[in-house]
């Protein structure tokens, strides 16, 4: 991963929120969310203005658009990782399709090979797989390290940690 990345593929809202918190959302060049699906206002507006390109979700990425957008880092969600049970995925036509574990593995293998061929490093954000809220929030430190904003990320995490302790104290008092 070249640090800092300049043109990022943002797989979903949770990643976009983390980038927004670090004032890095302007690095988003491409996304896996359609405008109507996006809940991050700034990213939704960038999609509308075509400052950010929709390149498809992980099941149907348009690699040519990633190259055209000069993406130099792809941040994907843990959804890309194979699961033991059949997984329902949506396609661009908004229909649902079930993928077997083998199909999921093949999809991941194909995707990683294509990213490698294109010279685009990829990161799988596992924050949504974390059980504890603080563990989810700690992913901000990962993005701080990747984008050279360690101090800002540490401050944000400390703030979240402090708020969590305050909330726990209030719960204990009840």
Give names to the regions the model predicted:
Residues 7, 51, 68, 72-174:
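Extracytoplasmic substrate-binding proteins
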Residues 1-105:
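A short, structured surface patch at a secondary-structure boundary
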